[in-house]
Amino acid sequence: FGSGTVIWGKKGTAPQNFARNNGNPFAALMSYPDVPEGIWFYNEVKYGYDNGIMTGTSDGNFGPYNALPRCQFAVILHRLAGGETVPFEQRYPDVADGMWYTDAIMWASEAGIISGYSNGYFGVADNITREEMATMMYRYARYKGYDTGARADFDQFLDGNKVNDFARKPMSWAVGCGLISGKYGQTVLDPQGQASRAETAIIIMRFMENIRPAAEVSSVSLDRDRIE
């Protein structure tokens, strides 16, 4: 193969090693059985896969319709930030040292991006809601120094008055800048509804392409997500 020939294959396999050793461009093949080409979230899932931001579950699938636990979203944001290591502190009774999500939660807590509940727990396995995700994305954008000035009026949504106070500004920003859109013909926000993994992939790609400055976008190679 010439040095300009694109080598296709799965990550971590012989084709990737060949491309690396011979200076060829490498294009990763995504092979989730539950994410066929042409499905409405395929491009976003592949974007997350290619950039090492959001990968599959332990059974080899992506789990697009599965709800996303809070600990997994902490891991995703940690990947976006480059995987900074923060010393462990016993901040939450349900976050032990040495777990696959511990570093991410320590970092996100230290950065003020994710906080626990009023009872002191983090809620590791609790499924993240749409308004919680908007809030964490908003805090992450502020942490990175990105523009968070966009705003949207909730009056266009039938349930706009159901957004909790803590999430009103973040949700207004997320809708205003196009990260989160309404459901059922743009009629409802569903703020307390659970965010699926497919929806999360879409939101992350929108953030990376439209909010995060293009010069900062880089691939991050990290371990796959896990479902506990």
Task: Describe each PLM feature range.
Residues 195-199:
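Acidic helix/loop microenvironments that form the catalytic cleft of cell-wall polysaccharide enzymes
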Residues 1-4, 157-163, 176:
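Ankyrin-repeat and related helical/solenoid repeat scaffolds used for protein-protein interactions
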Residues 29-42, 51, 55-104, 111-131, ...:
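Feature responds to low-complexity, polar/acidic, surface-exposed segments characteristic
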Residues 164-176, 201:
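Alpha-helical membrane segments in multi-pass integral membrane proteins
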Residues 49, 109-110, 175:
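Alpha-helix C-terminal capping/helix-coil junction sites
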Residues 1-30, 47, 107:
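Solvent-exposed loop and capping/linker segments of extracellular ligand-binding repeat ectodomains
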